[in-house]
Design a protein with these regions (language model features):
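Consensus "Asn ladder" position of solenoid repeat domains
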Residues: 123, 148, 169-172, 193-196, ...
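A generic tandem-repeat structural signature
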Residues: 132-230
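Leucine-rich repeat domain C-terminal region
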Residues: 304, 308-318, 322-393
Length: 437
């Protein structure tokens, strides 16, 4: 058991002269006493002061808890708003019962007890910084602080948190550059910094980390995406609602065996779609809507056997919608609206009837809800040319459903699509909402 003293040191009490006289000459028996007392005629001796008490003694279950106690109490004093009153529970030595704090045995000593996890999600706490708090919790493994009002920048000292594997700063008021300290955290697998005011670029080193989840959406990131984006081990990648520019890196195909969901939506991405997107055979969600992408849809997208949500709406794509894409058996939503496509074949038209495919506001003149002839003519008067056009006809997989013999027959829907069983919500799309995941 460890002990930690809390309190102030004892100080001598200053006694007034009248009190001195009352005690030294209690009966006024000496002449000097009489003369002194005459100066204090009518003055009563004050009551005896209460006895000094020793400081409170706090006893902790482990020395590691004693060490973080002053860290927590110092941080508590910086909090200017606590609408749920959670800090009222941050009293005494039982840190493991503080609201938002959770204890466990650290990896280096299974007999010890330490603060291993913090969950401030939804507390609405306001504080000027987390510096001096988070970076001093050396045994922390999980830190979640969604929907608070923490500000400032992220301290580079968090790189010393050797056990930290989940870090969530989402929906706060952090600013400055991307918190580069995280690139030195070898055990980090979950990084969520969405809904803040971070600016600048994403460091290339982030895409060499062993992350499972990376959410940076709804910030002010800009510049080009790193060329090594495809080197990532991330399964869920959300880059949406920023100001990223330039093309989608061709290296994305290197993430074929890991990437499950990726959101590029609502940025300023431009250029042509790389056919390497079709190599993402594990992908169930791919959304690059609301950008400035152009060119045809690569036929390689027909290799996305597991894809359920495929969204390229709100770009400048053109040409024919490949039938091989419409033939994908797990498609639940194929959004191609607000582009400049000119043709859809029988399989795609079948998806339109099923309300799986949306091609409104294109240049397919025999369908309703299309752009005007003049608007389409204006676009094609200044064609956007993609290099290596032959790559757009490549289907880099052996597909069980392609090619179909003439006449076209719509392929059977997969059992998962037929059963209509409720599915867990998409983690990436859920990240577009401010609440906790």
């Amino acid at each position: 058991m460890g002990v930690f003293f809390v309190g102030t040191s004892l100080t001598l009490r200053q006694c007034p002269l009248s009190l001195f006289v009352c005690h030294v000459f209690p009966y006024g028996s000496f002449h000097m006493g009489k003369r002194i007392l005459s100066n204090f005629r009518g003055t009563k001796c004050p009551p005896e002061p209460p006895p000094q008490t020793l400081p409170d003694l706090l006893t902790f279950a482990d020395q590691r808890l004693a060490i973080v106690y002053p860290v927590i109490q110092t941080f508590k004093k910086t909090i200017t708003s606590d609408p749920l009153g959670v800090t009222k529970t941050w009293v005494g030595s039982d840190i493991c019962n503080y609201k938002g704090f959770f204890c466990d045995s650290p990896p280096d000593n299974r007999t010890a007890t330490a603060v291993a996890s913090i969950d401030f999600n939804g507390f609405g706490l306001t504080a000027p910084t987390l510096d001096g708090f988070l970076d001093q919790l050396l045994d922390i493994a999980v830190f979640h602080a969604n929907s608070n009002n923490f500000t400032g920048t992220v301290s580079p000292k968090i790189s010393q948190l050797r056990y930290l594997y989940e870090l969530d700063f989402s929906n706060n008021n952090f600013s400055g550059k991307f918190p580069t300290a995280v690139v030195n955290m070898v055990g980090l697998s979950f990084l969520d910094i969405r809904f803040n005011s971070f600016t600048g670029s994403i460091p290339a080193q982030v895409f060499t980390q062993t992350l499972d989840l990376l959410f940076v959406n709804n910030n002010n990131f800009m510049e080009k995406l790193p060329d090594n984006l495809g080197n990532t081990s991330v399964r869920y990648l959300t880059l949406a609602n920023n100001k990223f520019m330039g093309p989608i890196p061709k290296s994305i195909g290197k993430a074929a065996n890991t990437l499950v969901e990726v959101l590029f939506l609502n940025n300023q991405l431009s250029g042509c779609l790389p056919y390497e997107i079709g190599l993402l055979v594990e992908a169930t969600v791919f959304d690059a809507s609301l950008n400035q992408l152009t060119g045809p849809l690569p036929c390689s997208l027909g290799c996305l056997e597991k894809i359920e949500q495929l969204n390229f709406a709100g770009n400048q794509l053109y040409g024919a919608v490949p039938e091989v894409v419409c033939a994908l058996g797990n498609l639940e939503n194929l959004s191609l609206s607000d582009n400049y496509f000119t043709h859809v074949g029988p399989i795609c038209r079948n998806l339109i009837k099923r309300r799986v495919l949306d091609v409104r506001k294109n240049c397919i003149q025999d369908l309703s809800s299309q752009r005007s002839v003049a608007e389409c003519a204006l676009f094609f008067a200044h064609p956007r040319i993609c290099l290596n056009l032959l790559s757009y006809s490549i289907i880099p997989c052996k597909s069980s459903h392609w090619p179909f013999p003439f006449p076209w027959k719509f392929p059977p829907r997969s059992s998962s699509a037929q059963s209509k069983q409720p599915k867990a919500p998409s983690p990436s799309y859920s990240a577009l909402i401010k609440h906790r995941l």
